[in-house]
Every structure is written in C-alpha cells, then in structure tokens.
C-alpha cells in the first residue's frame, strides 16, 4: 500500500489521503466513500480483488482518515485536491471512478468539470450496491413494486402511499 497526500496548489497544506493498492502500471480506479464513511469500511472487502487488475486509489477525505487531524471544509476544496492529485500522479487521466452516496457526487462533479479525464464514472447508492446479493435483490424488488406504477402513471397503486404523497405535495 502506498499512501499519498493530495495538496492544493498555492495554499496551505491540508491533508487528503489517497491509499493506493496494486501495480502502478495498471489502469487507475478511484474509489470515493460516502458521507461520514471511512474508506476501509466502504471498500476494504473489495480492494484485494480489484487490485489484481487496477491500481486502486481509495480516497480518504480530509478529516476522515486515522492519521488526519484536519477538518473537512467543503466539497469544492476536496474536489480541487482530487483533481490536482489526478493531474500530478496519473497525468490527468484515470480509467474509472466509483462513488457511493457523497462519493457519487464527487464522481459526477469530476465528469461535469472536465478538468481531468476518466473513461468511466460509476455513481452508486449505498442502499443497494453495498448490500449482499439477497438483500439487494429483495430491496430492488420492493422498490420496483412500490415505484413502478408511480413512474408510469404519476400515481401510487397503494391508496395509503398516494394520500401521503398528495399531502406532502400540498404542504407549503
């Protein structure tokens, strides 16, 4: 494992740690954890397998790493550090980025800002993409059953859900 700190150019040093795993000659896969999540908690169980084919770069936002005493300031500050890191360490290009929850917002911003290049951006939802297979299938089936009719007709099949929806839409 290699650990690097990303710094904002021309500003005081504020740590944001990138934990790297795998061969530097492999394509880069950046992993962005969710809100208030420790990178090992989100990704520790998949890093070994991913590092066989990728240089895995797990992001630890400022204030969210065991050796970091700084505090998280803003998404924009972190985004600038991430972009600077990608430019400085990966020549401005990564193969893919995956983010769940808040991490998905970082992936979307990287794509929208066009300051670095990534071939694939994967935006996940920690509710389903980190669940076990059975749990994810059950939750997906439930969500389809609850939302399918609403998506196609604008109304919920369940009278209780429809009344609640209308009540919430009428509230100021």
What is the role of each PLM region?
Residues 45, 49, 77-85, 109:
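Alpha-helical elements of Rossmann-like donor-binding domains used by nucleotide-donor carbohydrate transfer enzymes
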Residues 132-138, 148-172:
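Conserved alpha/beta-hydrolase catalytic His-Asp/Glu region
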Residues 99-107:
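Gly/Ala-rich beta-loop-alpha elbow adjacent to hydrolase catalytic centers
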Residues 1-15:
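N-terminal cap/lid segment of alpha/beta-hydrolase-fold proteins
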Residues 57-98:
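Active-site loop/oxyanion-hole signature of alpha/beta-hydrolase fold enzymes
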Residues 43-44, 68-71, 132-137:
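Short aromatic-enriched loop/helix-cap "lid" or pocket-rim segments at secondary-structure transitions
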Residues 14-68:
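Conserved HGGG/HGGXW glycine-rich cap/lid loop of the alpha/beta-hydrolase fold
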Residues 108, 112, 116-150:
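Flexible "cap/lid" loop of the alpha/beta hydrolase fold
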